[in-house]
């Protein structure tokens, strides 16, 4: 009886003392975005690059206000097996796609 009580106590102590990672956010699974939507962009560039900066200026957007990369001529990636389910160019997750398919802001690469 005494050994069973000791075993329960030791097991509870070991369980409570097991180190756990705190504050670490796991990466999203391949093909998923933490924020924004998946896009297939013909080109992904830094906001300060000439083509991206030119389009941003035409839209009245300050280059310094853009975080992440800029996707040019992007289309949404839909469910697997759909018409737009694959991407032969640059698959990215973008935060701001409110400019049609011309430009997407805040893009990060994603694996499909």
From Swiss-Prot:
Any one GO CC term of the record: fungal-type cell wall
Keywords: Cell wall, Disulfide bond, Glycoprotein, Secreted, Signal
Inducing stimuli: A CT-rich motif, which is often found immediately upstream of the transcription start point of highly expressed filamentous fungal genes, is present at the expected position. Two additional CT-rich regions are also found upstream of the TATA box in the promoter region.
Molecular function (Gene Ontology), one example: structural constituent of cell wall
Membership in a protein family: Belongs to the fungal hydrophobin family.
Function: Aerial growth, conidiation, and dispersal of filamentous fungi in the environment rely upon a capability of their secreting small amphipathic proteins called hydrophobins (HPBs) with low sequence identity. Class I can self-assemble into an outermost layer of rodlet bundles on aerial cell surfaces, conferring cellular hydrophobicity that supports fungal growth, development and dispersal; whereas Class II form highly ordered films at water-air interfaces through intermolecular interactions but contribute nothing to the rodlet structure.
Protein known as: Class I hydrophobin 5
Source organism of the structure: Flammulina velutipes
Gene: Hyd-5
């Amino acid at each position: 009886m005494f050994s069973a009580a000791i075993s329960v106590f030791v097991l509870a102590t070991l369980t409570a003392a097991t180190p756990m990672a705190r504050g670490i956010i796991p990466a999203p699974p391949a093909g998923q975005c933490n924020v924004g939507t998946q896009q297939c962009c013909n080109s992904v560039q830094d906001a300060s690059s000439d083509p991206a900066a030119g389009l941003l200026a035409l839209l009245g957007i300050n280059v310094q206000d853009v975080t992440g990369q800029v996707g040019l001529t992007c289309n949404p990636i839909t469910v697997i097996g759909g018409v737009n389910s694959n991407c032969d160019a640059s698959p990215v997750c973008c935060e701001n796609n409110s400019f049609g398919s011309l430009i997407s802001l805040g893009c990060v690469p994603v694996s499909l």
